[in-house]
Amino acid sequence: MYMFDGQNVFFDEDATYGKSWGVADYLDYTDTPLIVAAVECNAGANNERLVEYSPYRFDDKQYGHFDGKGKDTLNWFVHEFKPYIDANYRTEPDRAHTFIGGSSMGGLMSLYALLEYSDVFGRAAALSPSLWVAPEALTALVGRCKLAPGTVLYMDYGSREMGNHDGMRKGFGEMCSKIFARGINLTARVV
């Protein structure tokens, strides 16, 4: 499994906000045989993460204009990082055993990866994906992408995160409908 925001994946002392996902503890506790390759983001003071993890250009009222370099990031994942992991670790490199996941901007990148490279990634977990970045471009990608059969996506948002944001709830519902209509095996939840 490939994961974005690697600093948040394993240990609390490395996590951006002091609380990690605890993936290593979970895998140990459940005795799950899974290799997790988690890459840290560029979490600099100038919001480089937004550039690194957005496949699209976008404008933000608070932070300004961003030239998304997410396509470059994902190309590196697919054409350099994954081959390195496959060559140096005992992986099963086929799409049936290759997953990708992340949250927020990493969730957006995970969704983008599944749509652009469903021949590489068979499953994705897009947790609280930043769909607001470029909803029109993402919707267009959902409509035109070539999907391998058996593509699986888990996508969710937190109920407190959504709160009273009717636009967020509506956008999530619309995106889920479009994804489901393409035949992706989708599990979508507000938790």
Where are the regions a protein language model picked out?
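Non-catalytic cap/lid and distal C-terminal segments of serine-dependent acyl enzymes
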Residues: M1-V191
